[in-house]
Amino acid sequence: DRLMRDYPMLRLRAHGTAVGLPSDDDMGNSEVGHNALGAGQVFSQGAKLVSESIENGKMFASDTWKALVANVKENHSTMHFLGLFSDGNVHSHIDHLKAMLIRAKQEGVCRVRIHILLDGRDVGETSALQYVEPFEAFLSELRGSDFDVRIASGGGRMTVTMDRYEANW
């Protein structure tokens, strides 16, 4: 109490738009907080950058996207997506994946397989089904005779794929 009363202080917000996330409903994490504090200013980070690139069309106009689509179509191969599967909006958002799938279909990709990393950190630990079930319904609507899309594999994000807990890197 004495420190707060007798010395200058400033409260910092470490979530939402204060640290460059899309909305104030996004809880943030230490990474985005450190980036904002270290930079001394707020700048778009992670999922917000991806959202912006989808909204302004830069993602789909990029050489990488164009080459990926061209390669899959020319070789009659499968397009694969691997990534964090949640709406935590720190590292990713399911809407990013949906936008890429819709665009892949529009551009004539015929076969897509999705490899999901269940979150449990930026969202609730046991929340996987609340994301998988509606996403399966979305895939069913998107699927057609000319577009075969489905979840091919899945797993968790902890230890091996994203987080370093008890890992000796």
Predicted regions and their residues:
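Active-site nucleophile/metal-coordination loop of metallo-enzymes that catalyze phosphate/sulfate
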Residues: 1-158, 163-167
